[in-house]
């Protein structure tokens, strides 16, 4: 491989794999690895057991591998195995390894043949292995067998995709030679996720089970059905061999003998078999790790940056420091106070861009919700006139009055002012609710100290409740002050002299019409909900609201006006959301029981959020469109019953004139009261509740916490937080160490280019059968070459393969005694398994004694 650093690459990734698997970050990091993919009977498990030289994988009928097995092979002087979930325990008996795999599988999936994507990490140390990391995945199947779930095919496919879709995962596609290779499940999956073939390595098993007269020579030479990284053939133990306890050492010797003696494969013998496959995978994985090092390093750096800020507070953590808890308590209280102030004042460093929070929500209560609640409690026009007429008549008593009595004005105003108490109390309740939510939000940073968080929330919430009572008393006092004295000398009050004059002016204005430019109150998108039902769905229009009318256009350019609706006699009502609707709806209707728009009694308008609805309602209030009150229908029926009174009132011109005068006076005075209440309510709540709570947190919260009792109990750390801190610190140090190692290796290695692309269109056509010799015209960029061929297109430097003796004239090259005798596959020239031998086709079949040795 060129240097020692490259040899350390696979152990490095193994260490990363263990470290990040332990803290649940493996999927995010996407470490380089080899995923073994194939059908249920393709021979995947046998290939892995041949690598290790031991029987250690579960066997049986149906689906046996039900969880991914991350198999980490480490070259060492002693032979043993370790599981990540059994840290510190060494397994020297590989039968125990098999039982532990089965037990660990059942612990997660149960015993009902279910599957799980949670991997089992197994590390095998042995002098007979090369450094390698593979992931054994469940075999693909089409039909459920026994008690397998009906959708087992899709479950397994989903699990495979979780691994093979990662760019850093090499795919070991295992296919049996005795079935149609063009229909191989493994190659189909590989083609789907790796269309360029840059990550796929082909393995052909069961070469000894092919029909007589057939072979896979052209496939192994990468002429038929070529892959970019080529194919390697292996011969595994048969079921009879397994039942007969034939050991893997003998099986490897038999495999070697098979390739040396078979006339179709003997010229490829040095590039076939399990030992050679292991070497190639070691080289391919090493090269792949080196190629992915820059991307891996970038990911590690980004993860390190993302946790560095959080780890900063843990770095200097000293659990045995006696002053630690006191310092932490002071810091937590100070942080809580600062967060609360920032959330209320709106200068927080973490600004929510999705919804209103903290002070912004309280601001909306003050300036949208509270005015809306005030107007909801305002008088109904017809009802008010009827009350005024009764008040005037009752004040005059038996006499017929000549003048408009001011007592009627005072009685009516007091009744209207009294109604302001309910929305004022509701405003306080809404602010208390928002303050409590803000306290909970601010205390989220205290989750590492659950007792402290609980106690702090309790103390502050109790204080808010105390201030709530005081604030409500003050609010009631404000309303009572308004009731105590009617200031008819107020500069904004029109007075008796101007009341009639104003009434006349209003009548003239209505008669002449407003010719001046009308002030626009609001513009925005609204969906007309009910009209679109008959026309294929609701539609969105651009609405423009003024004091006189409501218009809507096709778009916000306001060129194509769809309709204009007068706001006179309009009212608002809420509409319940539909079963499948996510929009919030309100409706406009006419108080005189007329159609609002064409044949529709009401116009339903929809918004995306409740905040938008509230904002539109507040805008309609400014235009004089008030919400419907609960008792409107009953009052309407009462008005109909008392219709004779109304007619009688209207028949008396003097009474009608007096009612109009009082009506104008009440309207003028209530406007003053409303303005005063709307101005003083936020100020009262701010002073008595919000600012007071802020001062309490800054000055008294710490003293209250100290008086609660034992500070050690208060500052007990949650088990989850302690575990999280340990995990974050472990991850932080693992990331730093990994970056250090990667940095050293990346600067001392030489890049090896990828094998050239091949014609893999056969994976899409899937019409060529395997198992038969292909004609020499099979689509491939490679052909058999003479003994000393010139450099071919696509070659890169000296060709790998057998020793130079293979180029001797006339005779066949001597077959190396074992795969290890071939040139070092980790040398500078790339080892491309798909390249055929340069030896002449005719190879004598005399036995070679040196081919009997077994790789150690």
Swiss-Prot record:
Catalytic activity: GTP + H2O = GDP + phosphate + H(+)
Residue list for modification Phosphoserine: 306, 347, 512, 774, 778, 822
Residues holding GDP: 41, 43-46, 59-60, 206, 208, 211, 236-237, 239
Domain Dynamin-type G intervals: 28-294
Source superkingdom: Eukaryota
Transmembrane stretches, start-end: none
Modification Omega-N-methylarginine, positions: 796
Predominant cellular place of this UniProt entry's protein: membrane
Residues where Phosphotyrosine is found: 80, 125, 354
Free-text description of this protein's post-translational modifications in UniProt: Phosphorylation at Ser-774 by GSK3B/GSK3-beta leads to inactivation of receptor-mediated endocytosis in non-neuronal cells. Dephosphorylation at Ser-774, through the EGFR downstream signaling, leads to activation and regulates early stages of clathrin-mediated endocytosis (CME).
GO annotation terms (biological process): negative regulation of exocytosis; receptor internalization; synaptic vesicle budding from presynaptic endocytic zone membrane
Stored SUPFAM superfamilies: P-loop containing nucleoside triphosphate hydrolases, PH domain-like
Official protein name in the record: Dynamin-1
One Pfam family per UniProt: Dynamin_M
Modified residues (3'-nitrotyrosine): 125
Record note on quaternary structure: Homodimer; homodimerization is mediated by the dynamin-type G domain which promotes assembly-stimulated GTPase activity. Homo-tetramer formed from two dimers in the absence of lipid. Oligomerizes into a helical polymer that self-assembles around the vesicle membrane, when associated to the menbrane through lipid binding.
Residue ranges, annotated region (Disordered): 750-856
């Amino acid at each position: 491989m060129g240097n020692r650093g490259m040899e350390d690459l696979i152990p490095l990734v193994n260490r990363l794999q263990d470290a990040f698997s332990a803290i649940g970050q493996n999927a995010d990091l996407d470490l380089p690895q080899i995923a073994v993919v194939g059908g249920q009977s393709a021979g995947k498990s046998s290939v892995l057991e041949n690598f290790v030289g031991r029987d250690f994988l579960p066997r049986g009928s149906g689906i046996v591998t039900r969880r991914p097995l991350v198999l980490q092979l480490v070259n060492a002087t002693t032979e043993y195995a370790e599981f990540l979930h059994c840290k510190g325990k060494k397994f020297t008996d590989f039968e125990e390894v098999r039982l532990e795999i089965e037990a660990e599988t059942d612990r997660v999936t149960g015993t009902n043949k279910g599957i799980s994507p949670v991997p089992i990490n197994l590390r095998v140390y042995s002098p007979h292995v090369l450094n390698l990391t593979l992931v054994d995945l469940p075999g693909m199947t089409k039909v459920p067998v026994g008690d397998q779930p009906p959708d087992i095919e899709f479950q397994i496919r989903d699990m495979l995709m979780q691994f093979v879709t990662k760019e850093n995962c090499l795919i070991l596609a295992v296919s049996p030679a005795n079935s149609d290779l063009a229909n191989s499940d493994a190659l189909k999956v590989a083609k789907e996720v790796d269309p360029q073939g840059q990550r796929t390595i082909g393995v052909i098993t069961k070469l000894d089970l092919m029909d007589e007269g057939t072979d896979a020579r052209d496939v192994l030479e990468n002429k038929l059905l070529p892959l970019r990284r080529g194919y390697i053939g292996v011969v595994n133990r048969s079921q009879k061999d397994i039942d007969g306890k034939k050991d893997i050492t003998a099986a490897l010797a038999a495999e070697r003998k098979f390739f040396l003696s078979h006339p179709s494969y003997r010229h490829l013998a040095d590039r076939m078999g399990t030992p050679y496959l292991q070497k190639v995978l070691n080289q391919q994985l090493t090269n792949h790790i080196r190629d992915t090092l820059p991307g891996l390093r970038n990911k590690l750096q980004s993860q390190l940056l993302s946790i560095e800020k959080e780890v900063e507070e843990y770095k200097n953590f000293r659990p045995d420091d006696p002053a630690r808890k006191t310092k932490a308590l002071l810091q937590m209280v100070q942080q809580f106070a600062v967060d609360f102030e920032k959330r209320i004042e709106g200068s927080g460093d973490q600004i929510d861009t999705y919804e209103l929070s903290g002070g912004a929500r309280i601001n909306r209560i003050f300036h949208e919700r509270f005015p809306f609640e005030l107007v909801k409690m305002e008088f109904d026009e017809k009802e008010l006139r009827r009350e005024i007429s009764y008040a005037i008549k009752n004040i005059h008593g038996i006499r017929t009055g000549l003048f408009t009595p001011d007592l009627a004005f005072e009685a009516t105003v007091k009744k209207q002012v009294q109604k302001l108490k309910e929305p004022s109390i509701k405003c306080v309740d809404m602010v208390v609710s928002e303050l409590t939510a803000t306290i909970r939000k601010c205390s989220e940073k205290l989750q590492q100290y659950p007792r402290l968080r609980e106690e702090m929330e309790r103390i502050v919430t109790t204080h808010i409740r105390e201030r709530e009572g005081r604030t409500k008393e003050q609010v009631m006092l404000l309303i009572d002050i308004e009731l105590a004295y009617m200031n008819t000398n107020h500069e904004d009050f029109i007075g008796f002299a101007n009341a009639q004059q104003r009434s006349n002016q209003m009548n003239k204005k209505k008669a002449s019409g407003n010719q001046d430019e009308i002030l626009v109150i609001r513009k925005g998108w609204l969906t007309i909900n009910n009209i679109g039902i008959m026309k294929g769905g609701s539609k969105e229009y651009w609405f423009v609201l003024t004091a006189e009318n409501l218009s809507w256009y096709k778009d916000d350019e306001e060129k194509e006006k769809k309709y204009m609706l007068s706001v006179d006699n309009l009212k608002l009502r809420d509409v319940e959301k539909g079963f499948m609707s996510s929009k919030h709806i309100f409706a406009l209707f006419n108080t005189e029981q007329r159609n609002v728009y064409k044949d529709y009694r009401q116009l339903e308008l929809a918004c995306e959020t409740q905040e938008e609805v509230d904002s539109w309602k507040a805008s309609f209030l400014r235009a004089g469109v008030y919400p419907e009150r609960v008792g409107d229908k009953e009052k309407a029926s009462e008005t109909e019953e008392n219709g004779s009174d109304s007619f009688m009132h209207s028949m008396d011109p003097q009474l009608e004139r007096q009612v109009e005068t009082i009506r104008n006076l009440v309207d003028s005075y209530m406007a003053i009261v409303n303005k005063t209440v709307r101005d003083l309510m936020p100020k009262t709540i701010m002073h008595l509740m919000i600012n007071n709570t802020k001062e309490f947190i800054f000055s008294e919260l710490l003293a209250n916490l100290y008086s609660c009792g034992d500070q050690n109990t208060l500052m007990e750390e949650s088990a989850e937080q302690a575990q999280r801190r340990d995990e974050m610190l472990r991850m932080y140090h693992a990331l730093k160490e990994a970056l250090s190692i990667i940095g050293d290796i990346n600067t001392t290695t030489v890049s090896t280019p990828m094998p050239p692309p091949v014609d893999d269109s056969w994976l899409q056509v899937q019409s060529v059968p395997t198992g038969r010799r292909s004609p020499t015209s099979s689509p491939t960029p490679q052909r058999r070459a003479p003994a000393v061929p010139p450099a071919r297109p696509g070659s890169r430097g000296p060709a790998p393969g057998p020793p130079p003796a293979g180029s001797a004239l006339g005779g066949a090259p001597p077959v190396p005694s074992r795969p290890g005798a071939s040139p070092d596959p980790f040398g500078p020239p790339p080892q491309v398994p798909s390249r055929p031998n340069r030896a002449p086709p005719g190879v004598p079949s005399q036995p070679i004694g040196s081919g009997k040795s077994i790789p150690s």
